[in-house]
Amino acid sequence: MVKFFQPKIDPLPTGIDLTGKTAVITGASAGMGLEVTKQLLRLRLSTAILAVRNVTKGEACIKSLLQDRGIQTHNPKPTIKVMELDMDRYDSVQQFAKTLREEVPVVDLLILNAGVASLNFERSPSGHERVTQVNYCSNVLLVAELLPHLEAGAEQTGSPARISWVGSRSHETPSFEKKAPIEADEGVLEHMDKEEAFVPFQRYNDTKLLCVLFLYSLAPRLDPKKVVINTMCPGMVNTGMSNMLPLHLRLIFNVIKAIRARPVEVGGWIILNAALVAGPESHGKFLADKTITDKSAIVTSPMGQDIQKKLWEETITEMSKLTTLPPQFR
């Protein structure tokens, strides 16, 4: 049961210095992505790669970041690059990854923040339902495309690269339980792509469950001395995610946000705790706020385990048609 009032979160510990480090932040032009980028630069991050769908908007973000007093004080001459990444399209993911591998020798940190929520059923160019494509499929492809590059960088630096994937406790309440169960003879992605299986207010939850299930399958296949991967839920944060709601619902939700939601700064602390502070013990784990938690009941249930197994097999089959997969994806 989610408590209405969220617990107090302490700031990041002092003394974090990211001089010489490079971070890639997806969905970096607004909301949590922009806030995380700002906080990283205040921590003296040398190079920030803003992976954004709208390059013009991303370029405007550079100007605002360079005008931030905290960045001017602690990190007056960072390198900030904008690169196009449209998570709605596989070809954009692959072009982004190719350019990154060619132009950025070492990536120390990859923050998978880009995501969408929608109450409308739409299809991406791949044929997948759009929320599934953006939140799940494209993130998996991006990790597959960049994993060897992250590992190579870790060998150069002597420190593991980090992948921190922004998740949500909402994965605990998917539509699969009651409203739109996956049939025994039905594929997971096949189910997600059926319009009749689209439950508007739970589709975001569904995709976040797919993300955490994939992470639980992938993490044991990775060497945490080379790459540490984790996921976290920053709780309800005061961002523009509710803008997709109809006006009458948005008004209600905005009242709840005004009472309950955390400032974006606090959400940034939670994401960067997973990315920078949590140690190797966080590898393959879900952090609720800053706390490493056990797998949720839905994940460990027979239904969850069946979905996890099928999802891994289906995802690997699809990804193998798009790219040469690293050994850990086989």
UniProtKB/Swiss-Prot annotation:
EC number assigned by the record: 1.1.1.-
Keyword Cell membrane included in the entry's annotation: no
Active site, per annotation: 204 (proton donor), 208 (lowers pka of active site tyr)
Gene disruption phenotype: Loses the ability to produce yanuthone D. Also leads to the loss of production of yanuthone X1 which does not have 6-methylsalicylic acid (6-MSA) as a precursor.
Domain of life: Eukaryota
Biochemical pathway: Secondary metabolite biosynthesis; terpenoid biosynthesis
Gene3D superfamilies linked: NAD(P)-binding Rossmann-like Domain (3.40.50.720)
Keywords, in A-Z order: NADP, Oxidoreductase
UniProt-listed GO biological process terms: terpenoid biosynthetic process
SUPFAM superfamilies assigned: NAD(P)-binding Rossmann-fold domains
A Pfam family annotated for this UniProt entry: adh_short
Applied value in biotechnology: Yanuthone D is an antibiotic against C.albicans, methicillin-resistant S.aureus (MRSA), and vancomycin-resistant Enterococcus.
Task of the protein: Short chain dehydrogenase; part of the gene cluster that mediates the biosynthesis of yanuthone D, a fungal isoprenoid epoxycyclohexenone that acts as an antibiotic against fungi and bacteria. The first step of the pathway is the synthesis of 6-methylsalicylic acid (6-MSA) by the polyketide synthase yanA. 6-MSA is then converted to m-cresol by the decarboxylase yanB. The cytochrome P450 monooxygenase yanC then catalyzes the oxidation of m-cresol to toluquinol.
The name this protein goes by in its record: Short chain dehydrogenase yanD
